[in-house]
């Protein structure tokens, strides 16, 4: 087994699901496990969520849903990114529920379901202001009227997506108002939906009116609030610890260089520890000279350029030996390195930091 592993706490995952349920009330959870469950391992996380009674999964693409089906998961699977006509057959064959905003795709679903003698299901995706994907609210009624002619297709749900559910709530409320107006228009014309969903992680907290009967938590499942100011309210527990072991310790002297490009020149005698983790594992090269790690509950800084497979740490004169545990994300003793800490150093968001952890890092599920 590799020394570099991601340890996933099922106990912390259960805590986070319980917290989301307590806030969401009667709304059921669509557990968003796209992008390899935000880097946590889709099959492992889906297995743990099944134990917790989660009945709906959200994925980005049909191929993610197919992987779940081929691994025996029977939950409803909603494909959250609109698919092309060519993937309509996959959605029907694997009983996936895609979002729909193209009538041509709706026709393709109908054809495939009719040919198979089954019923295809979809959720109408309304664009309320993000301008990324979705159907214009002005076209929603016309779409539903035309869709009545399509055999073996049930538009069982309707949804939208917020652009600013953590910061600009004025805009988010405008989106919610537009979504509600669209719902009212469709309802007045005889169209109701079994499932309605809009609330992502931020909206579950900040826009309780947007919860409807389904909510879509993503990063909150994995222990990180959508913004730092919601940390206390949510009281989540990060479920991932990224850790490795020291594989080499060497003594260097004043004037010695470390790593590619001779970018680090030591100003005195010190010890350097090498660990088997690098940007090939998803630990960004952009963290060079910026990030720290934990050894024995103490913070140490990286020196030299972070390589594809290894990185180097200034351990000074401390007694550190090969085999000692090194934590890159998570707790060790009383110290904690969060994905937020690393994302701040990279000028990005914690979603990217965690999702970037590559497939060659084994995910180990504990508790």
Residues covered by each model-derived region:
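Active-site-proximal beta-alpha core segment in soluble small-molecule metabolic enzymes
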Residues: 4-15, 22-197, 211
């Amino acid at each position: 087994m590799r020394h570099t592993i991601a340890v996933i706490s099922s106990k912390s995952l259960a805590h986070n699901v319980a917290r989301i349920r307590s806030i969401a009330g009667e709304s059921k959870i669509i557990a968003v496990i796209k992008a390899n469950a935000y880097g946590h391992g889709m099959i492992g996380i889906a297995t743990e969520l099944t134990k917790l009674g989660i009945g709906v999964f959200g994925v980005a693409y049909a191929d993610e849903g197919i992987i779940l089906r081929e691994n025996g998961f029977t939950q409803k699977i909603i494909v959250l990114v609109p698919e092309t006509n060519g993937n309509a057959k996959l959605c029907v064959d694997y009983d996936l529920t895609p979002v729909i905003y193209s009538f041509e795709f709706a026709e393709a679903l109908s054809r495939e379901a009719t040919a198979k003698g089954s019923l295809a299901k979809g959720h109408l995706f309304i664009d309320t202001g993000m301008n990324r994907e979705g159907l214009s609210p002005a076209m929603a009624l016309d779409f539903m009227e035309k869709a009545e002619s399509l055999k073996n297709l049930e538009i069982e749900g309707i949804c939208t997506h917020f652009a600013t559910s953590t910061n600009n709530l004025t805009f988010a409320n405008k989106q919610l108002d537009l979504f509600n107006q669209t719902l009212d228009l469709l309802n007045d014309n005889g169209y109701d939906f079994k499932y309605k969903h809009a609330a992502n992680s931020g909206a579950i907290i900040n826009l309780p009116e947007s919860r409807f009967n389904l909510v879509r938590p993503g990063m909150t499942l994995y222990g990180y609030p959508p913004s730092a100011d919601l940390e206390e309210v949510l009281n989540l527990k990060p479920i991932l610890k990224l850790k490795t072991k020291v594989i080499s310790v060497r003594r260097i002297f004043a004037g010695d260089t470390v790593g590619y490009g001779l970018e680090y020149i030591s100003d005195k005698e010190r010890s350097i520890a090498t660990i088997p983790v690098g940007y090939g594992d998803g630990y960004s090269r952009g963290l060079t000279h910026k990030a720290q790690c934990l050894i024995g509950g103490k913070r140490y800084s990286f020196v030299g350029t972070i390589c594809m497979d290894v990185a180097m740490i200034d351990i000074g004169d401390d007694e550190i030996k090969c085999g000692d545990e090194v934590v890159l994300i998570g707790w060790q003793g009383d110290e904690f390195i969060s994905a937020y800490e690393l994302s701040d150093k990279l000028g990005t968001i914690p979603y990217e930091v965690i999702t970037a952890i590559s497939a060659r890092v084994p995910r180990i599920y504990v508790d």
